[in-house]
């Protein structure tokens, strides 16, 4: 169920402060964050976020099509290496 419109999108306060400070100064530095739950808002356009995936920080450049999504959607937490092919020759021995 989506969030109520009267509440507005959720963005962590510390993250919003960092974005506002960079917008005022005009700098485009990487913002390191652990807040995967924060919604991407139009103020974040053009910024690069280093989103934590549990192991390392993944760089995510925000563009218009990402507005309304969560930061965590663009930093996958699981690495799928594929299924092992069944090797019949080694199984017989």
From Swiss-Prot:
Gene3D superfamilies reported in the protein's UniProt record: 30s Ribosomal Protein S19, Chain A
Entry keyword set: Ribonucleoprotein, Ribosomal protein, RNA-binding, rRNA-binding
Keyword Ribosomal protein annotated: yes
Entry keyword Ribonucleoprotein: yes
SUPFAM superfamilies associated with the record: Ribosomal protein S19
Gene Ontology terms: biological process: ribosomal small subunit assembly; translation
One Gene Ontology cellular component annotation held by this UniProt entry: cytoplasm
UniProt GO molecular function: rRNA binding; structural constituent of ribosome
InterPro entries: Ribosomal_uS19 (IPR002222), Ribosomal_uS19_bac-type (IPR005732), Ribosomal_uS19_CS (IPR020934), Ribosomal_uS19_SF (IPR023575)
Family: Belongs to the universal ribosomal protein uS19 family.
Function: Protein S19 forms a complex with S13 that binds strongly to the 16S ribosomal RNA.
Stated name of the protein: Small ribosomal subunit protein uS19
Native organism: Saccharopolyspora erythraea (strain ATCC 11635 / DSM 40517 / JCM 4748 / NBRC 13426 / NCIMB 8594 / NRRL 2338)
Gene behind this protein: rpsS
């Amino acid at each position: 169920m989506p969030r109520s419109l009267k509440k507005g999108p959720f963005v962590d306060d510390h993250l919003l402060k960092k974005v506002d400070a960079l917008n005022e100064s005009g700098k485009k530095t990487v913002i390191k964050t652990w807040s995967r739950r924060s919604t991407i808002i139009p103020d974040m356009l053009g910024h690069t976020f280093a989103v934590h995936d549990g192991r390392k920080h993944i760089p995510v450049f925000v563009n218009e099509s990402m507005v309304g999504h969560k930061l965590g959607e663009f930093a996958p937490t699981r690495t799928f290496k594929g299924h092992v092919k069944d090797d019949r020759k080694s199984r017989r021995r």
